[in-house]
Structure formats: structure tokens, C-alpha cells
Amino acid sequence: MATNITWHPNLTYDERKELRKQDGCTVWLTGLSASGKSTIACALEQLLLQKNLSAYRLDGDNIRFGLNKDLGFSEQDRNENIRRISEVSKLFADSCAVSITSFISPYRVDRDRARDLHKEAGLKFIEIFVDVPLEVAEQRDPKGLYKKAREGVIKEFTGISAPYEAPKAPELHLRTDQKTVEECAAIIYEYLVNEKIIRKHL
């Protein structure tokens, strides 16, 4: 760890909040592969941007092929993957944006660390359990990953040969086999409004 770095003062969070007219937070979507996390994240990002609110989505496409391209899928690498995502997401939240993350993030301890990281910085962290029965996720299987996992082609696949630890007390619990993508995005939006993280835009 570098020890010769000086932390330079910057705009305070409250000053940024006043200038941008919105609070920052991290919306952390967690759930099985094919549960609908990325689809909901895209819909939520579009909804917020259409209302002239600052939002940015972090997912496998812009993390695994860039910042975390050196990581595999061992438990150690998964932990480091989530640690880095937590740090980046915190930076977006600190800039008074709604940072939307959509990762399986299967281990409860990693998600708790992400929450603690935000709490220590005085930033809001909203954990959302994107829930779907395993059999429904397997029926969806848009990338054919469950099929490969069942065949043994993919090792350590969450939900099949590796564990998924469901949140115990998420801020929101969405059943995507019972609600549409649009309904899920709207529920999250209303939560952010009700918690006074963002202002309601018509």
C-alpha cells in the first residue's frame, strides 16, 4: 500500500449535493444469473436519466472487460471483484449520482462489506434482492450458462455448483417472475423518492 500519498481536500459532499440538486447512493442489485438484474438496471438507469437525474450503471460488460479483466471466478477472485466494484460504486455515489450495480455478488459477507464501506463514508446503500426461482432462471438461461453448468462445462457456477447466499434484510425484494421489468424499475424509483434520495420528476 502506498504511504506517500496526500489526501487533498475537495468539494464537500453537501456542496456537491446542493450544486447537483440530488443525493447520491448505490443501488446494489443481487441475484442469480438470469434473475433480471441487468435488465432492471438498464431500465432504471434510463428512467432516471430521462428525468434529468444523474445515474450510472456498473455491470459485467463494463467491469469484467476493463477494470477487473485480470480476475477469474474463484472465490478469491469473486471477492476481489466485488471489493473493487464497491469502491468504484462508492465514488459514483460520492459524486451525487445514483450508482446502479448489477452483479450476482453471491456472498453475503462481500455485500455487507460494500454496505459498511458506504456507511463509513456517510453514503446510502440500497440492497435489492432480484429474486426468481432457480427453475425459472434455468428456463430463461439467455447465455446458455445453466446448461453448461449442468453438463459440467462451467465449474463453480452460482446456484448449481457454487452457493448463493440470499440477502437477509434487503431494502427491496423483487420477484421478477411476478413483476415486469418496468414495474421493478418503478418500484426502485419510488423507493428513492420516498427516501428523499432523489426528487420526484414528472
UniProtKB/Swiss-Prot annotation:
Biological process annotations from GO: cysteine biosynthetic process; hydrogen sulfide biosynthetic process; methionine biosynthetic process; sulfate assimilation
Record-listed E.C. numbers: 2.7.1.25
InterPro entries xref list: APS_kinase, P-loop_NTPase
Active-site feature positions: 105
Keywords: Amino-acid biosynthesis, ATP-binding, Cysteine biosynthesis, Kinase, Methionine biosynthesis, Nucleotide-binding, Phosphoprotein, Transferase
Enzyme class: transferase
Involved pathway(s): Sulfur metabolism; hydrogen sulfide biosynthesis; sulfite from sulfate: step 2/3
Binding residues for ATP: 31-38
GO molecular function (one): adenylylsulfate kinase activity
Catalytic activity: adenosine 5'-phosphosulfate + ATP = 3'-phosphoadenylyl sulfate + ADP + H(+)
Cystine connections: none
Family the UniProt entry places it in: Belongs to the APS kinase family.
Function of the protein: Catalyzes the synthesis of activated sulfate.
Protein name: Adenylyl-sulfate kinase
Lineage: Eukaryota, Fungi, Dikarya, Ascomycota, Saccharomycotina
Name of the gene: MET14
